[in-house]
Amino acid sequence: MKQRSDWPMLEKTENILKKLFRGDHAKMTSIIYRNFRRMTNKEFVYGEIDFLSFHNILENAQPKLGDVFYDLGSGTGKAVFTAALFFDLSKACGIELLPPLYTKANNQLKKATSFFQNLKPDLESKYLEKIPTIQFIQNSFLSYDFHDANIIYIAATCLSDSTWESLINKMAHLNPGTRIIVATKSIQHARFEIIYQGIELMSWGLCPVKIYRLA
């Protein structure tokens, strides 16, 4: 198989993301907080993306210049940073309810600014200009207004049926053409047309992923 012409830059970006999130310990942070708060709701079980696998997933969502990306339940921001660094988005936003994960995500944003400033000049300018497009919101994705989304990612593996149904009903009011990336679960609704399905690598192993487009 012929190697992609952009592979060297993909590899560079992946390495930068790995260095940025080294020592992140997001899963342990989530476990400690949930245990301390005696939170037994399985919806908050923590899982993460694989950087290159998520790049492949996003490519199948057909991102356009200036698109707006949301990660619903964004943890410490891996999917948000991956979307922002690999693609030319106008906004990459993570919505996270748990305070320590939200705090870590914002700390990552500060760390990224400093980290990018120490890269070679050509890479420094490429990645520093992405920083203003990245933001994190502490809120419930069922409450927050993300109507400006063009692409949404949901790790739906542990969501309850009632939460999932509420979220689908909310997303059904989004603009035509909005793409919804879903890990594990499916959407049964007249407005959602499936445009991709495959098995992709996540932190917990191989996972079915579907991408829908709103009619």
What are these regions (language model features)?
Residues 1-65, 104-146:
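S-adenosyl-L-methionine
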Residues 79, 100-101:
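Conserved short alpha-helix immediately C-terminal to the canonical SAM/SAH-binding motif I
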Residues 66-75:
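Conserved class I S-adenosyl-L-methionine
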Residues 91-96:
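Conserved SAM-binding motif I beta-strand of class I
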Residues 150-162:
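A short SAM/SAH-binding and catalytic strip from SAM-dependent methyltransferases
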Residues 159-215:
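C-terminal substrate-binding/active-site "lid" region of AdoMet-derived donor-dependent transferases
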Residues 78-89:
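Conserved SAM-binding loop of SAM-dependent methyltransferases across substrates and taxa
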